[in-house]
């Protein structure tokens, strides 16, 4: 589609085009007037949007809308002031331009997971992880890893998990005494229960959290899924590796402050925590750099509690590059998928 990418928005420009509604609410200002408050996005990024005409009905979350607007600035952050808005009709837009997608094909990322399962010599872990992948089913191919922060994209959960798996392989060359099967198992299953925690459409847009997600969260649900997978595979729940894997799931946020009721208590659990944090943080910073010109600081990032600087990297263009479209995803170097564990699905 011939329109300006969100990542290249600047103050005072005018915009007319199609965007995807990630959030959409009608709110009431301090003076009692109604207005629309939305997050609109294309595949390169998102922007907060306001429409001060409170008589307009908010579009559904996940809908594609056509807007005529001006880019303004509020509290140091770009904001869209909408003059006109309507829901788009099918055929007016190219969805691949609007949906943030993982930069690699889902099938190739999934093959990295099954390859790791195929390499496992620990039969208990291989059976449990294989069963948990079966339980995740087709939704794993398109689910994001989060609603707004890291890997909030179509196939983001696979992107996050496969990237962590590659980090784990690198770590094992430095610390070969770690239990490879246990570390791989923890990486693969640690966030699978996000599928039960969030409601996502096939475009990878999270519309809400489930009752299960709000009452339990993916850490607690993840533990119950490990136990359920063990039960299905007729593995005693008091088997030590079942308990170790449950501990890795419930401790991978590191501290009670971040949701883990227990800190990591053995080396593979500790390593899982740091691999998870590094991959999430690097993904978030990469997204920030895409939105920030070289030589400039970003707006303050609330999740990091700081601004991020975009250095003048050698050979890099000043303008942030938009993410590749889903159908243009580059092929990712990975272990030979032909040896992947074939019995998972």
Where do the PLM segments sit?
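Divalent metal-coordination and catalytic microenvironments
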Residues: 19, 62, 164, 249, ...
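Divalent metal-dependent catalytic cores for phosphoryl transfer on phosphate-bearing substrates
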Residues: 149-150, 159, 170-294
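Acidic/His-rich, divalent-metal-binding segments that scaffold phosphate/diphosphate chemistry
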Residues: 94-213, 234
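Short, acidic/hydrophobic/Gly-rich beta-strand patch recurrent on exposed beta strands
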Residues: 37-42, 200
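OB-fold single-stranded nucleic acid-binding module
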Residues: 23-34, 46-50, 54-96
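OB-fold nucleic-acid-binding modules
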Residues: 1-16
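Acidic, low-complexity intrinsically disordered tails
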Residues: 311-345
